[in-house]
Every structure is written in structure tokens, then in C-alpha cells.
Regions:
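Basic, helix-initiating cap at the start of DNA-binding domains
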Residues: 1-27, 31, 56-60
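Amphipathic C-terminal alpha-helical segment
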Residues: 153-170, 185-194
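Amphipathic alpha-helical packing segments from all-alpha helical-bundle domains
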Residues: 115-141, 145-150, 173-185
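Amphipathic alpha-helical segments used for helix-helix packing
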Residues: 99-115, 160-168
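Generic hydrophobic, amphipathic alpha-helix propensity
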Residues: 13-22, 37, 62-66, 70, ...
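Append "Primarily bacterial transcriptional regulators
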Residues: 36-40, 48
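N-terminal intrinsically disordered/low-complexity leader segments
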Residues: 1-13, 194-216
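Hydrophobic alpha-helical connector segments
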Residues: 75-104, 125-128, 151
Length: 216
């Protein structure tokens, strides 16, 4: 089989080939540099520098691909969730994506974002807007920023708890049900009035303010 060289790539194909090689190395847990990726893609050692200034630029390009793939996983046509149940399925898809692509997910969220990479910033913003748009449509009177932070924190936390082995991964179905059950439990708890004993206990734990002494 003939060796692939940089001369065989058409315009735009070299970048795609480098990203495929880098993604394969990332998911396999192989440390990579631009030179290592070039060897994996079977191109010249200097070829990657045509598209990526350094390893950080290559990592940002992988993160961009990850954000876009995750957004498609949540909504193929980019439409916001049309119901609360669909919003919950967004959370399920988010966690399952993390388990299917652990190294990529960690690269996307577990490392400091390169704020100087406009494409990466935009891709992350588009993912956030999918959630924000869903919340605006479903809960028009809510504090959307606070609600988005809460929902993302729960979902993101579940993703990393599974990745870190703090929660058993099990089958896809088991993980999906755990995500659904967790969100359902929170919805139920916050929609149910606190019992008298709970409120009494909270009051008992509230420290009594001591009046300030008069200076007279």
C-alpha cells in the first residue's frame, strides 16, 4: 500500500487528516505533539504547522470539534428543547457523550480554555446558547442564568462523577436512568413544600442575632 504524503491531500484535507490522527491518539490515551500527529497521519513533520501554530492550537481545534459534536448529539437540528422531558434527555445525552469520549470531554472541559481562540469560544458559546434557549422557552419567568448554572452543574457533575469512577458506569441504560432519576428527584424536592419539622429544624439552626449594646 503506498505511503500517504502531503502531496496527496487536496486543499482542506490535510487539516482534517491531522485532526483525525490527533483525535485517535487522544482517545487512545497516547501523548501527542505536532510531530507525533504528523507521523500518525503519514505527512511531513512540518505539515501540521500549516494549520496549527502549536499543540495548544491543535487541542483547541479538537475541542471545537467536540463542542460541535456534543451540540449535534443534544439536538440534530439545533432546536432548543420543546418540553421538560426533552430537556432531561439533553442531560442524558450530555453524560453519555462524556462516557463515550472521556479523553475528548476532559480536553473540552477539564483544561483551561484558550480564550484567544475565537473558534473555540464560539463553539462553546453555541452549546451554552442551546441550553439557554431551551430554558427561555420552557421557563419564561425564571432567572435563566441561575437556572442554566444549576442544571449544567448537576449534569456536568454527574458526567465527571461517572468518569472519575465515583458513580458506577454500568450499561448505557443504567447511566441514562440515573441521570433521569437524579433530575426527577431534584424537581420533586424543590416543587414540594418543606414539612413543618424541616422548617422548625431550619429555624432552630438559625443563630439568634445578639442586639448591639447601646453607646449611651
Amino acid at each position: 500500500m503506498p505511503t500517504t504524503t502531503r502531496e496527496t491531500y487536496h486543499h482542506g484535507d490535510l487539516r482534517s487528516a491531522l485532526l483525525r490522527a490527533a483525535m485517535a491518539m487522544l482517545e487512545a490515551g497516547e501523548p501527542f505533539s505536532l510531530r507525533a500527529v504528523a507521523r500518525r497521519a503519514e505527512v511531513s513533520q512540518t505539515a501540521p504547522y500549516r494549520h496549527f501554530a502549536d499543540r495548544e492550537a491543535l487541542e483547541s481545534a479538537l475541542a471545537v470539534q467536540g463542542f460541535r459534536d456534543l451540540r449535534l448529539r443534544l439536538s440534530l437540528d439545533g432546536s432548543p428543547a420543546a418540553s421538560e422531558d426533552e430537556l432531561v434527555e439533553f442531560a442524558v445525552a450530555y453524560v453519555l457523550f462524556a462516557l463515550e469520549h472521556p479523553a475528548l470531554f476532559t480536553l473540552m472541559f477539564g483544561r483551561e480554555c484558550d480564550d484567544g481562540n475565537d473558534e473555540r469560544v464560539l463553539a462553546a458559546a453555541e452549546l451554552r446558547e442551546l441550553l439557554a434557549g431551551s430554558l427561555r422557552g420552557l421557563f419564561p419567568d425564571a432567572d435563566h442564568d441561575a437556572l442554566a448554572t444549576a442544571l449544567w452543574s448537576v449534569t456536568h457533575g454527574l458526567a465527571f462523577l461517572h468518569l472519575d469512577g465515583k458513580l458506577p458506569s454500568g450499561s448505557t441504560r443504567e447511566v441514562a436512568e440515573r441521570v433521569r432519576d437524579s433530575i426527577a428527584a431534584l424537581r420533586t424536592a424543590f416543587s414540594t413544600p418543606a414539612t413543618a419539622s424541616s422548617t422548625d429544624g431550619a429555624a432552630a439552626r438559625t443563630p439568634t442575632r445578639v442586639p448591639e449594646e447601646s453607646s449611651a
